[in-house]
Amino acid sequence: MPECEAYLSGRYEPHLGKEDINDMNSARRFDASQGPRIIGPRDGKLVDLGPVGVRFLVWGEESGGGFSLVEHPIPPRHLAAPLHRHSREDEYSYVLEGRMGALLGEDVVYAEAGDLAFKPRDQWHTFWNAGDTPCRILEIISPAGFERYFEELAMGVGSADEYQRRYGTEADFESIQRLCAEYGLRFPPIV
């Protein structure tokens, strides 16, 4: 999915792929030690992971390890991730635009622009674009560290088992087909 449909039609230009993800440290980053600062709508780096994009805004080392902040652009009717849970992090998803569907434990919920969904650690969850227009969410991950999962996934190094062990996650990959059928979603393979 080229640059998540050019950053969901905003014609986003920056690209970060396997070949240049190691240049992340040279990218302009937020640094709390530099004092107050604005992170603009085109700052950060967008990584195209197939079904969902990741725009890195605040890294853990920039927040003293307290949190990381990423933006996920999700194309219409796409599942963002298999059913999964984290053993270390809580996640907060703030819907910027569109309609996000989420399975939180046993509950299916829907969040519109301006809504915040809380996904506590150890709870099975997944999320998707539940609409026919682009969806964008800001994801606050606390404590920080899990943003490195996206970085490594984009580099294409390691196996799913390795990632899950390293980042303290579990994923139910068999849930993908069921979730797509139940909610009319697509989930292209990550390349």
What is the predicted role of each segment?
Residues 53, 92, 99-101, 108, ...:
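Structural motif
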Residues 43-83, 89-90:
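A short glycine-rich, His/Asp/Glu-containing loop-to-beta-strand
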